[in-house]
Every structure is written in C-alpha cells, then in structure tokens.
Amino acid sequence: MGRLFIYDENMTDERAKITVAKMADISDIVAQEKEYIKYSAKGAVTVSAGSVIAVGEMAVFKTAETVLTKANLDQGADFTHGSDYYIYICDPGTNAQDEVYVISLNSTFPDGEVWDDTNTRKIGGFHYGRVRNTDDYGRPVNTSGSVRGSGWESNTRVDILPNSVWTTKHRPKCDPSGMVYLGNALWGDIYISSDDGANGLQSIYDGTPITGTEGLNWYIAGERARRVGKRLPDYMEFTVAADGSPQGLDASNANGWTATTNKARTAVGKIANAVSSFNICDMAGNVWKWLNELLHDPTGASWAWYDVLGGGYGQAYMANSTGLHALIGGGDWGNGVHCGSRAVNCSSYPWNVAANIGVWCVCDSL
C-alpha cells in the first residue's frame, strides 16, 4: 500500500503525474444511470452517452450514444434463438482510436486474435429468444393492440428480450445469464430450471426440466438454487412473473405443454405461445414449480412426531403424516385447462419426490 497521488507543483515526483494507467487503476464504470445499456429496437440495444469506463491499464473511454446490433457480433451473421450474449467495450490499441463494441457468445472476452482479457471489458449482456408483445403496461395484446383480444396468445416474436438486458450495475446478484428483470429489484429465470451438472441449477433454452426423476423435492430445490445464488419464489412472485402465459388446453399443446394425452415433461422454451408478459417460458404447464410457501392441513388430528424428512434430517411434528404442504404453481404436462399463470396446488408435501414437479428460480438485484 502507498500514496498513489501527491501534490508536487514541479512534477518531479511520479506520484504527482496523472496518467491513463493511474486513472484506469482507480476507475470503475462511472455512469449516470445503472441501465446504461437498454433495448432500443428489434434486434438492437443502445449504449447511453456519458459513461466513463476503464479498459485494461492503458485506456479510459467516455461513451457516446451508440446503437449495437448483429453487425457488432464477433462471429456469425445473426443472433441465435435461446442464446446469451455478452457486450464488451474494447481498446483498439492506439491513442487515436475510440472504443470498439463487440457482442459475443463468449463470457470471458470476444473471439478474434486481437482481443483478450487485457484490452476488453465486459459491460453487459442480453438473451435472444421468445418475446411476448404487450402494451405499455405489460399486458398481452393481439396483433391489433387489443389487450387479451382475439388471438393474443400467439402474438409473440423472436428478438432480444428487452428485460434481459443487463449491465454491471443493473443485474442480479447471481450470474445474469438466462434471466430477466421483473421489477422491484427482482430477477427471474427465463426457463424452468434444469440440472447444471454441478449440483446446482441453470436456466437454458431446450433444457430438460429437473424434477423428482432426478431426486428433486422442495428441500433439494432450495439447496440447488442456493448454490447458484438463487432462491424459490413465493406465490405472488410466481403469479406476477407468469402473467401473460396463456391458459392450458386439454386437447392441444398450442399454448403450452398441457394436453391431457401427454405422458411426460418436454424440453423448455420450444412452444411459441408458452411465454409470459415478462418473457418467461413454460410457466403454465410442462411441470409444476415448487414455491417458497408452506401450509398445514387443517383437518389433521393425530399430532405426533413423524419421521418423514429423510435419514439424518430430524422429524416433523404435525397433525398427520403429510400435514405440512408446500405450494406448487403453474400445472404440469397433462393438466390441460387447469394450467395457468395463477394455477396452484396445495396438496404436495415438501419431501415429496415427484416426476411432475420441478422448479423455477428468482434472484434479488445486486
């Protein structure tokens, strides 16, 4: 540790000199607003003007308003459905050149021989996938703009998810990949959770929902969510995030994986209509989702200790052997019209391991 700057009117002491390297050392990202990158048009995001950003040891840039599109990709000609993209500000290496913006699938630094972790800085990102068209209040509309008017269920598009755009200052506490902003300092996964292969969970397009088939119950869902910095939602958080998801159908999977003839879960994010106003997929149907709310069976009368929690986890004092219940939301693959954004089942106990119950996660803002 030592003094970085001193006053020396003769400038003979190196510590008196203000250099780019010193400014880079002390500069974070200084922005007038947390959301210094925003969705601005179909296939485009805009970096706002006036942010000061250090890149590596030799560059400090002040941003101008800049629109970024697929033309900024480091590889490929267009965005890919179901992919997370990362936005980098890059130092081209000479004092005469301004910053360069690159959009990449890589989460470390962009592709290309000239780029590495010394001359690039990740400043944000977004997800490209299914978006539900809404009015200014977030209500689903049909192609004529009528709220829940005829045919509203199919009025979706493939685009940058506007509420998936994140920055270093506007993001969840966890990895922001595969998440959208729900408002009120809360983020939610875009996809029902699948197994990340490391005893945690992930939100990815075309993933297989994790359920009791992989040993999931309410307790394990919470443990896996915690390992990746997330948590289970309560019922209100779930219904808000799921709003705009069409009600299920008995005889069709057009609005979600809900037809009563279905036999099992399916890959997430594949049904065009099955997206909420917050651009979250499969909230109605496919598998039930564990919620962070409990209740007790009011009809029980046989109060006692019940050894139902599994070996080594203690016992539950209840009015019957399944007295404690955990809510599950949304419906599953064969529930038909029972599926929906407010659908709830109050009969499942938290130690239940069921092939039709999965999990969807949220995370608080950083």
Where is each model-derived feature located?
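Glycine-rich, flexible loop motifs
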Residues: 26-83, 92-93
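Acidic glycine-/aspartate-rich tracts in secreted/extracellular proteins
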Residues: 91-97, 192-195, 293-296, 333, ...
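Disulfide-stabilized, aromatic/cysteine-rich ligand-recognition loop
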Residues: 214-216, 311-366
